[in-house]
Amino acid sequence: MCKGLAGLPASCLRSAKDMKHRLGFLLQKSDSCEHNSSHSKKDKVVICQRVSHEEVKKWAESLENLISHECGLAAFKAFLKSEYSEENIDFWISCEEYKKIKSPSKLSPKAKKIYNEFISVQATKEVNLDSCTREETSRNMLEPTITCFDEAQRKIFNLMEKDSYRRFLKSRFYLDLVNLSSCGSEKQKGAKSSTDCASLVPQCA
């Protein structure tokens, strides 16, 4: 396996350094790390310790593959942030967290928080929804349920899939990940190549 950047060929090292510069976001505290509530907030360690070339390539197969992977979600979120359009993925993440709520008493306050942040007229991070979906979601706020954001989340997912996801696949964020993850194969022929994310993302504290 590819252990860090030191063992890579010179050409790969240049690519790695360039990628490390472009993906400096991974060295900082990432909201996507906080998405996994099973880890202590005091000492969060990045889940994506290793990303194989095969996994990175799968991100190009579908948006679902991309955002269901910890590193993929982090890269996509950073790409959207660089375009000042991260509200869509933030809304999607909030909806995913909302659907995991077990206590009925916590649904209403969380639903209102999401609504005020992403959907209301005065939302600080308003997402682009059609009037019908926005009105439907507003009505759902009268008696919030676990599915009250499902339609809005589906619309935003489709929007990202048709727009920002396609741009992401052509961006340096993604292309650098593909190039670096393939470098391992130059050193070990026949072995499953992988990128050691720990060399780029030591921790998310």
Curated annotation (Swiss-Prot):
Indicate yes or no for the key word Lipoprotein: yes
PTMs?
Answer: Palmitoylated on Cys-2 and/or Cys-12. Phosphorylated by cyclic GMP-dependent protein kinase.
**Annotated GO biological process:** negative regulation of signal transduction
- InterPro entries, from UniProt? RGS (IPR016137), RGS_RGS4 (IPR034953), RGS_sf (IPR036305), RGS_subdom1/3 (IPR024066), RGS_subdomain_2 (IPR044926)
Please give the sites of covalent lipid attachment annotated as S-palmitoyl cysteine: 2, 12, 95
Spell out the coiled coil positions from the record: none
Which Gene3D superfamilies does the UniProt entry name for this protein?
1.10.196.10, Regulator of G-protein Signalling 4, domain 2
Q: Does the keyword Phosphoprotein apply?
A: yes
What protein does this entry describe?
Answer: Regulator of G-protein signaling 4
From the record, give the cysteines joined by S-S bonds.
none
Function of the molecule:
Inhibits signal transduction by increasing the GTPase activity of G protein alpha subunits thereby driving them into their inactive GDP-bound form. Activity on G(z)-alpha is inhibited by phosphorylation of the G-protein. Activity on G(z)-alpha and G(i)-alpha-1 is inhibited by palmitoylation of the G-protein.
Q: Which UniProt keywords apply?
A: Lipoprotein, Palmitate, Phosphoprotein, Signal transduction inhibitor
Looking at the record, the residues that make up the RGS domain are 62-178
